[in-house]
């Protein structure tokens, strides 16, 4: 692969416990395959400090997003729907670190307007979870006047995704696409609306095996095969798309 080719992982979970013992080697492996920017998302305010701390420690490679996932829970307790209190707890910290963030995320259907809904925030970049809620999520974002939107690991119908394309939204494709029922999505989406992600440690090429950012090449290779174009072209265009979604990444990429 040419040295000038660079990759962006638009969505992964840096603070997941699965990475606690070897995060350094995970990041080194990511750099080895050409990843130059990894967008790390948070799901609740309890993760915010760790996301910020690790992004500062790995400045120039890891870039933070802070948000409230629509499903809250832990390994020791049951899952529950996020509440407005979760959002209220998160907002002061999001504001505190706003200058360091590349986007708001991970957010979902119920709370995207609450976190970014004013006229001044319409251009706020958003990293969005829309599982089982593709059409209402797209409609809501469009009604809010959102402009820079990434819908990660979209699981809706391709026809619904095309409504997002018409609104100018982007869709990131994880490595699990090689074994996914969503392969029709890749066939129909224009490459100009695609980005790459891993959603590590989930959505890897193999079930029940920890996913890592280095596996992002599985996404790119699959897209190249389906579209009948070179891997280099897929990487070049998806990276350009990532810079449109996350303009703050522009200055860190090789010229």
From Swiss-Prot:
Its EC number is 3.1.21.-. The keyword Metal-binding applies. Binds 2 Zn(2+) per subunit. Exhibits AP endonuclease and 3'-exonuclease activities in the presence of Mg(2+) and Mn(2+). In contrast, in the presence of Ca(2+), shows AP endonuclease activity exclusively. It is found in: Nucleus. Its cofactor is Mn(2+); Ca(2+); Mg(2+); Zn(2+). GO terms for cellular component: nucleus. Zn(2+) 2 binds at residues 106, 129, 152. The 3'-exonuclease activity is sensitive to the metal ion present in the active site, whereas the AP endodeoxyribonuclease activity is observed in a variety of divalent metal cofactors. 3'-exoxonuclease activity is suppressed in the presence of Ca(2+), Zn(2+) and Ni(2+). It comes from the Eukaryota. GO terms for molecular function: metal ion binding; nuclease activity. InterPro entries: Metal_Hydrolase, TatD-like. Keywords: Hydrolase, Metal-binding, Nuclease, Nucleus, Zinc. Zn(2+) 1 binds at residues 11, 13, 106, 199. The keyword Zinc applies. PANTHER family: DEOXYRIBONUCLEASE TATDN3-RELATED, HYDROLASE OF PHP SUPERFAMILY-RELATED PROTEIN. Belongs to the metallo-dependent hydrolases superfamily. TatD-type hydrolase family. Exhibits 3'-exonuclease activities and apurinic/apyrimidinic (AP) endonuclease (in vitro). Show preferential AP endonuclease activity on double-stranded DNA substrates and 3'- exonuclease activity on single-stranded DNA. This is Putative deoxyribonuclease tatdn3-B. It comes from Xenopus laevis (African clawed frog). The lineage of its organism: Eukaryota, Metazoa, Chordata, Craniata, Vertebrata. The gene is tatdn3-b.
């Amino acid at each position: 692969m040419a040295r000038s080719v660079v990759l962006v992982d638009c969505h992964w979970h840096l603070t997941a416990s699965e990475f606690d013992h070897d995060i350094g080697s995970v990041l080194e492996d990511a750099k080895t395959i050409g990843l130059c920017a990894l967008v790390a998302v948070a799901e609740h305010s309890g993760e915010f400090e760790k996301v910020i701390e690790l992004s500062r420690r790995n400045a120039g490679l890891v870039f933070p997003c802070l948000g409230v996932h629509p499903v809250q829970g832990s390994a020791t307790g049951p899952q529950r729907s996020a509440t407005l209190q979760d959002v209220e707890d998160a907002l002061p910290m999001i504001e505190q670190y706003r200058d360091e963030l590349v986007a708001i995320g991970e957010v979902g259907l119920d709370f995207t307007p609450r976190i970014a809904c004013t006229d001044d925030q319409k251009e706020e970049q958003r990293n969005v979870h829309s599982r089982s809620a593709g059409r209402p999520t797209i409609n809501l974002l469009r009604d809010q006047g959102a402009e820079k939107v990434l819908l990660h690991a979209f699981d809706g119908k391709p026809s619904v995704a095309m409504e997002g394309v018409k609104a100018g939204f982007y869709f990131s494709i994880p490595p699990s696409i090689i074994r996914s029922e969503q392969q029709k999505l890749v066939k129909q989406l224009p490459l100009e609306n695609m980005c790459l992600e891993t959603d590590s440690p989930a959505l890897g090429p193999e079930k029940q095996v920890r996913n890592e950012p280095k596996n992002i090449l599985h996404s790119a290779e699959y897209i190249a095969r389906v579209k009948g174009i070179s891997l280099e072209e897929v990487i070049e265009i998806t990276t350009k798309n990532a810079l449109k979604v996350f303009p703050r990444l522009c200055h860190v990429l090789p010229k």
